[in-house]
Amino acid sequence: AVVDAVARLGGDMLLLVGDVFDHGRVPDSVLEAFLEEIARISQPAVLLPGNHDLYDDNSLYQREVFQHKPDNLHIITQTDGEALSFPELTLDVWGRAMVSHTPAFHPLEGMPTQRNGHWMVALAHGHFHFDDDRDQRSSPIYPPEIAAAPCDYLALGHWDRHVDVS
């Protein structure tokens, strides 16, 4: 399991970049099992909602079960972007919660340019557009946006393949 790997490999943090759940109709028992798994590690876990587990008015992350989440689980909920600071790691994590998976949603929009001397990791859940892509997809992420991103590391979610987009 991913949680076991974080502990075994001595990871500083667990990043969950969207689509942790396939849809918002997941039973509470599954959500409780997820929270129990996260509670097994001492490292912080940061979760960014994606297109399958949106952060909207009916979000599963707003259910009662998440009112009792472990202290190490941090959920990005701001749809215009949010930075979480982890001073003990000299690290800030920024992301933009997805409220709607449409071409109008730009996952990297609003990333802060001001730095406080910490490393900055950005989380973005969307469709990476190669230069030769002709179609307009929802939640687009374009190469110039990545090149201009003022972060030290960008963790992308949504695609199910390994691609270096640096």
Q: Language model features by range: what are they?
A:
Residues 2-5, 30:
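Glycine-rich, highly charged phosphate/nucleotide-binding loops
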Residues 4-16:
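Active-site metal-binding motif and surrounding structural segment of the metallo-beta-lactamase
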Residues 19:
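Active-site rim/loop-helix segments in enzyme catalytic domains that contact anionic ligands
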Residues 13, 24-166:
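His/Asp/Glu-rich metal-coordinating catalytic cores
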Residues 1, 22:
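Acidic/histidine-rich helix-loop elements
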